[in-house]
Amino acid sequence: MSAPAAGATAGGDDAADRNVEMWKIKRLIKSLELARGNGTSMISLIIPPKDQVARIQRMLAEEYGTASNIKSRVNRLSVLGAITSVQGRLKLYNKVPPNGLVVYCGTIMTDEGKEKKVNIDFEPFKAINTSLYLCDNKFHTEALQGLLADDNKFGFIIMDGNGCLFGTLQGNTREVLHKFTVDLPKKHGRGGQSAVRFARLRNEKRHNYVRKVAENSVEQFIKNDKVTVAGLILAGSADFKTELGQSDMFDQRLQAKMIKTVDIAYGGENGFNQAIELAADTLASVKFIQEKKLIGGYFDEISQDTGKYVFGVKDTLAALEMGAIETLICWENLDIVRYKMKNSLGEDILLNLRPDEEKDKSHFTDSETGQDMEIIETMPLLEWFANNYKNFGAALEIVTDKSQEGAQFVRGFGGIGGLLRYRVDLAHVDLEDELDNIDLDDYSRAAVVSHWAPYSFLLLFKLVSSFFFINLFINYPALSNYNISLSQSSSSLIAISHTTLYSKFLFHFIEFAPRVPHYCRFVWSVDAFSSAGKASHVCQHTEKETFHARNEDAIGGLFNRTKVEARATHSHSMTSTLSLPSVDVSTRNSNDF
């Protein structure tokens, strides 16, 4: 069981690092709360700043003597072992760290019913002013919960003609405290002599509505004669919010906490969300607003197709290893596990699997030998990111799904992505990896001949028909008013493109495109082993000139384009040279074939 790294700055200068430390604390609390042991062998020790390590050591020595009198032998040995472990941990510290020290030691029971020793010590990322020593059958984490809460909580009062809502915003948590509805009379021009009476009744009900809101605000935001929020924001349509803020019925303590009044177009929870957005400049320090802004910027990059974004486990890890990711965005409950394994050759294999993929045993089997690979290490991918993101020069942002943008990021992009420093063509990276994995023995002469033998007749037919039509147009020029010619000394080009292990052999015999009606073109292409939907379009040039092959890779409806430079050499074996005037042969696109 891992613990948060010690030595985090007390002030939390780097907000991203602070959020990572908060996630580590949250994950630690969750795992410690589930741990259970036999007897009272689990020790929870919290030492506040400026306390003395020597004093704690003396206290533990006294506890050791007391625990020696426990009658149960098993429980006595467990407690003594836990106290000894705590004493050993304290020997690592000459003094209490600036933010205090947290120690958890003991023997817990695993899901398989086996005993497991747990020893955790760390300095929290901000000061913890609590002193605690408990020996129980569970770890006590109540004091750590205060580390997760932001210092500032803001209150919201949403008023309109249909009702009122009271809510709070703290960190990335939005909470609705109370809401009620009202039925207020509307303005109208009827009434005759009773019009004044109707107006008086309407104003009376509005007054009673404002008074009810003022009374409820005291119940929701004042506890034990103290205001429970750092600031109060009034939001609503019409003049209700203004009347409330200026009314004598509104508690003076709450009036002093008013920081902003905003106009909204909705009531209820929709109005609550709109009020949070409109008050974003005031609430800039709240994590909820920061999270919405971060993911909103990520969506803007995608909508504008800037290419400076990445999503998905494979592409995100590839960009991270290249050092291209500036901000790594991950969902706090990302359920991907990182496996490090060894195959029969002693090579390290890394896999990142989701829970449904872990059920497939083929991921843990060596494809060459059929034997199970040795699992060296398993770790949640998010924990690996938290421990290593600085090594790649990236900032890690851990987000929730409590905001609308966060929920969309989790559902639509799997909860993992990143903002890039510059554009990265990940399709080109994948292509290079695939080319490195190609075994040329699979394309031996015998294999190629045996595969292409059935197509030999078709090849012969295409070549013969090509020369037939050429001679036809040369001998009978009246058939066309257009000139017929070939490109200089390089009339045919063979392009063999290896794109995957089940590669494509794409033979393009681009033969004499005469500009006659309907453009008679004699092109033969064979697409074999098509598994990745890739094709290479070759632009023909003169001998020993550079050509560019444009790779179009259709994955998930997106096209990633990669330019690959190669050298074209003159092919004499499959080319016929004719002394005809030369014109350009236009490059075909995918629709031509």
From Swiss-Prot:
The record's listing under Gene3D superfamilies reads: 3.30.1330.30, eRF1 domain 1 (3.30.960.10), eRF1 domain 2 (3.30.420.60)
- One BP term from GO: cytoplasmic translational termination
Cytoplasm recorded as keyword: yes
Give a yes or no for keyword Protein biosynthesis in this entry.
yes
Main location class = cytoplasm
Sorted UniProt keywords? Cytoplasm, Protein biosynthesis
A GO cellular component entry from the record: cytosol
User: What compartments host this protein?
Assistant: Cytoplasm
Q: Which GO terms describe its molecular function?
A: sequence-specific mRNA binding; translation release factor activity, codon specific
Q: Give the record's subunit note.
A: Heterodimer of two subunits, one of which binds GTP.
Family recorded in the similarity comment: Belongs to the eukaryotic release factor 1 family.
What NCBIfam families has UniProt attached to this entry? aRF1_eRF1
What this chain does, per the entry, is described as: Directs the termination of nascent peptide synthesis (translation) in response to the termination codons UAA, UAG and UGA.
Q: Could you identify this protein by its name?
A: Eukaryotic peptide chain release factor subunit 1
This chain's source organism reads Caenorhabditis elegans
Q: Which gene encodes it?
A: erfa-1
